Amino acid sequence: MKVAVIGAGLAGSEAAYKIAQAGYKVDLYEMRPEKQTPAHKTPYFAEIVCSNSFGSESLTSGAGLLKKEMEVLGSIILDVAKEFKVPAGQAFAVDREKFSKKLTEILENHPNINVIRQEVKTLPDADIIVIATGPLTSEEFSKEIQKITGSEYLYFYDAIAPVVDASTVDFSKGFWADRYGKGTGDYFNCVLSEQEYEIFYQELLKGEQVPLKDFERAVYFEGCLPIEEIARRGKETLLYGPMKPVGLIDPKTGKRPYAVVQLRKENIEGTLLSLVGFQTKLKYPEQKRIFSLIPALKDAEFVKLGSIHRNTFIQSQKLLKPTLQLRKKPNILFAGQITGVEGYMASAATGIIAGINVARMLEGKEPVVPPKTTMIGGLINYITTAKNELQPMGPNYALLPELEEKIKGKEERKLKKAEIALKDIKEWTKEIESAVFI
């Protein structure tokens, strides 16, 4: 059977290597350097285009746990990265050029990997295909993905609102309700008085913003204004927009609040809550500072901060099985940021799972899904079951199930979840008995 992996980024590199290591031939397509993206500069695979950090190594961070799980599964990205690690405190940082160059050499010289340097415009002739073309997928291949998935399921921009850990919200500073009493009370309304709104509004206007890159300039014309841009249109504009209190009565006062910030469940379990309509270009420290002025969020832990930037990704919850296979065409798998995961390690992790599942399909075995108790499993569960429109997500502990036993202390709870995750990923690896682990 013929196998093709499209895109030699972090996810595509992991997938191709897993398939090749299992003893199967794979065509790995990469359009660079024949055709560059606006962000890439080199011809190397898995080029690190933003920060050179792969995130914290601490087990109390989602990124730290994810890397430990990837080590258990065998990650070529991490193996190479360790050779070119640079001092960065608790973070895992790499010499980006040496890392990408070495990885490229390994994949190009692998006897089972046939590297094809050309832009893919239509699906190649192959029995099994992994699409891992990333956030800057070419225009031509984006059209092909639209044909495969349906145009309404392919997004070209992130307009991401911040997401908080529900367990850190002060629920005494608001109430659950839908507007006009409709629905089942799915929104938590963070209440602000006139004075609190005034302070919030003034700080929002002062907040430092991230400048848009040239290739992101068109985003504002997509009808998705950042909250700070709405605020600049006038002091009361937010009160008729994302902070409008109409149709809501505070049960404590029996009156309509002056302003509200609505929180909506991001996952089925309700452990993640997003700030509705709060997409923003504010710098990260500014977001934490300003959004913490909302009384209910004074001590909230932000597991994801807002952004607006160019990012091609599919609505995986409508399209993918938890095995990363396309529901309607299970011989096509997706991996990496195009699935709606965010960050280097999350992208690489989905590539590992896609590679494992392709190898299993070639072995005549059923594709598999990692346990939801693991960070990899939690991420895949999130992107394939998101309640509303999928907004990209990176590794964080709110993706994992709540503990059955009560443990005091946030760090202690995270460490217990990490212990369970590592035990479960090791057991799962033994259970699936695939050639990829030989």
UniProtKB/Swiss-Prot annotation:
Asked if the keyword Transferase belongs to this entry, the reply reads yes
The cross-references to InterPro entries, in alphabetical order and at most eight, read: FAD/NAD-bd_sf, MnmG-rel, MnmG-rel_CS, MnmG_N, TrmFO
Keyword list, A-Z: Cytoplasm, FAD, Flavoprotein, Methyltransferase, NAD, NADP, Transferase, tRNA processing
Q: Does the keyword tRNA processing apply?
A: yes
Q: Which reaction does it catalyse?
A: uridine(54) in tRNA + (6R)-5,10-methylene-5,6,7,8-tetrahydrofolate + NADH + H(+) = 5-methyluridine(54) in tRNA + (6S)-5,6,7,8-tetrahydrofolate + NAD(+); uridine(54) in tRNA + (6R)-5,10-methylene-5,6,7,8-tetrahydrofolate + NADPH + H(+) = 5-methyluridine(54) in tRNA + (6S)-5,6,7,8-tetrahydrofolate + NADP(+)
Tell me where it resides.
Answer: Cytoplasm
What's the top EC group for this one?
transferase
**Gene Ontology cellular component list:** cytosol
Tell me the protein family, please. Belongs to the MnmG family. TrmFO subfamily.
What HAMAP family does the record tag this protein with? TrmFO
What is this protein identified as?
Answer: Methylenetetrahydrofolate--tRNA-(uracil-5-)-methyltransferase TrmFO
Tell me what organism the protein belongs to. Sulfurihydrogenibium sp. (strain YO3AOP1)
Gene name for this UniProt entry: trmFO
